[in-house]
């Protein structure tokens, strides 16, 4: 995996501008902050992020993948304000579960998610090396 950083661009904080990779592609559907029984256990934004990331890790593990194989994430949040207010705690949760691996990322505020109590949904793409 190669991180793509154009010359003279400032280094991004917490994500990469691009990733080049070869291997088996894994596409992970949007994961929300519910557990394996489809129950949201917390209304706290950071805790929903924690569970969504745990769900991504579980799907990856089903294909012998690891967090460092993630090349792209798209975060859908229902409140930009709540996302930004939780930024430090989200970063702590992210580093705890994913480590200091920062794939290409996008965050988008949406009007709502399909599950009423969900505050965040995260899609991921991973490449497991050949």
Residue ranges and their predicted role:
Residues 1-71, 77-130:
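N-terminal presequence-like segments and the immediate start of the first folded domain
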């Amino acid at each position: 995996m190669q991180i793509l950083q154009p010359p003279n661009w400032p280094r991004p904080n917490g994500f990469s501008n691009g990733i080049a990779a070869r291997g088996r592609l894994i596409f992970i559907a949007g994961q929300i902050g519910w557990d394996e029984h489809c129950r949201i256990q917390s209304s706290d934004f950071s805790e929903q992020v924690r569970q969504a990331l745990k769900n991504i890790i579980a799907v990856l593990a089903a294909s012998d993948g690891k967090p460092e194989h993630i090349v792209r994430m798209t975060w859908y949040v229902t409140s930009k304000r709540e996302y930004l207010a939780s930024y430090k705690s989200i970063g702590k949760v992210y580093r705890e579960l994913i480590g200091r691996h920062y794939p290409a990322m996008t965050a988008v505020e949406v009007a709502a998610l399909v599950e009423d109590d969900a505050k965040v949904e995260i899609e991921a793409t991973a490449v497991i090396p050949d």
